[in-house]
């Protein structure tokens, strides 16, 4: 009840013109007029639906467990969704590469930030797979054959674009000529970081000619002229703001990539221990060795120098 003499309580701005002053009492859930969906389109016989737009039928029909074990569905979906996230990461990285070549850095910043968020999604996905116990994995492992995430061609392209080049990693894809050719082109092209170093040179930093004309099929190696350029950027960030922001986007990206690798190792150790991987690698020891790979070395070295 409103005390005498007080002004009327303000009406809710979202209420209708004839809304009562009394508190609103929700209608029964079955009342179509209040359900919120009564004007939604319900007939899609002549138009595109949500499932049509997303091609959900082939996506949801792509899980084909080979074992009778209940947990294999988790294993399949974990890896399929990871491949979809990697597809997006590659899409954004290719666009970022093109923007950097064109000196259009603000769009590249957005794309690189998105890749870092994709990698965070991939890190969290390991938490779902980690609900699988060693005994559950052992029940389905014989059905995997020699298939292994080591053979993921999208992951290999991701490594190549980020600068971890290794021509031997083309061999698992020799039986698929189109994929092999695509990966070989990525191996021979400048990496993301190579393009950023070319950007440093275009902005007037004295980068060694041999670094600008390197063998792109080799993994990234530390270069003192590149570190000197980044040192100048970090010492005067306001004078080189775009390059400073680029450096931090790259550090964010590698940090997220390292976390993804680390979570992969710990999940493998949790589920299979130190058994050999299905693809023939040493398993967890191989994955631990990959933790030592540094994608953008000068950006980490410069932090010690500052």
Curated annotation (Swiss-Prot):
Sequence intervals crossing the membrane: none
UniProt entry tagged with the keyword Ligase: no
Top EC class for this record: oxidoreductase
UniProt entry tagged with the keyword Metal-binding: yes
E.C. no: 1.13.11.11
Catalytic activity: L-tryptophan + O2 = N-formyl-L-kynurenine
Cleaved signal peptide residues: none
Domain of life assignment: Bacteria
Binding-site residues, substrate: 75-79, 137, 141, 278
Cofactor note: Binds 1 heme group per subunit.
UniProt: heme binding residues: 264
Its job: Heme-dependent dioxygenase that catalyzes the oxidative cleavage of the L-tryptophan (L-Trp) pyrrole ring and converts L-tryptophan to N-formyl-L-kynurenine. Catalyzes the oxidative cleavage of the indole moiety.
Annotated protein name in UniProt: Tryptophan 2,3-dioxygenase
Species for this entry: Burkholderia pseudomallei (strain K96243)
Encoding gene, per UniProt annotation: kynA
């Amino acid at each position: 009840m409103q005390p005498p003499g007080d002004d009327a309580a303000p009406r809710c701005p979202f209420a209708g013109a004839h809304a009562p002053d009394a508190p609103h009492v929700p209608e029964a859930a079955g009342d179509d007029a209040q359900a919120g969906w009564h004007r939604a389109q319900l007939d899609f016989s002549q138009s595109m639906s949500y499932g049509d737009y997303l091609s959900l039928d082939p996506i949801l029909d792509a899980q084909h467990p080979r074992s009778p074990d209940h947990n294999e569905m988790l294993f399949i979906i974990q890896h399929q969704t990871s491949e979809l996230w990697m597809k997006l990461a590659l899409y954004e990285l290719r666009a970022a590469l093109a923007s950097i070549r064109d000196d259009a850095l603000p769009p590249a910043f957005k794309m690189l930030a998105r890749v870092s968020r994709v990698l965070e999604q991939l890190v969290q996905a390991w938490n779902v797979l980690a609900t699988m116990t060693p005994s559950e994995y052992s029940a389905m492992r014989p059905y995997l054959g020699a298939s292994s995430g080591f053979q993921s061609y999208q992951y290999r392209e991701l490594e190549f674009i980020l600068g971890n080049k290794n021509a031997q990693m083309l061999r698992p894809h020799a039986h698929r000529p189109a994929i092999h050719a695509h990966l070989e082109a990525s191996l021979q092209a400048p990496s993301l970081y190579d393009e950023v170093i070319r950007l440093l040179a275009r902005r007037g930093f004295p980068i060694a000619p041999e670094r600008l004309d390197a063998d792109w099929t080799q993994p990234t190696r530390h270069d003192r002229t590149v570190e000197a350029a980044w040192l100048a950027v970090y010492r005067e960030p306001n004078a080189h703001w775009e390059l400073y922001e680029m450096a931090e986007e790259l550090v964010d990206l590698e940090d997220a990539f390292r976390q993804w690798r680390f979570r992969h190792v710990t999940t493998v150790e949790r589920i299979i221990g130190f058994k050999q991987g299905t693809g023939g690698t040493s398993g967890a020891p191989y994955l631990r060795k990959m933790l030592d790979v540094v994608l953008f070395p000068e950006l980490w070295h410069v932090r010690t120098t500052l």
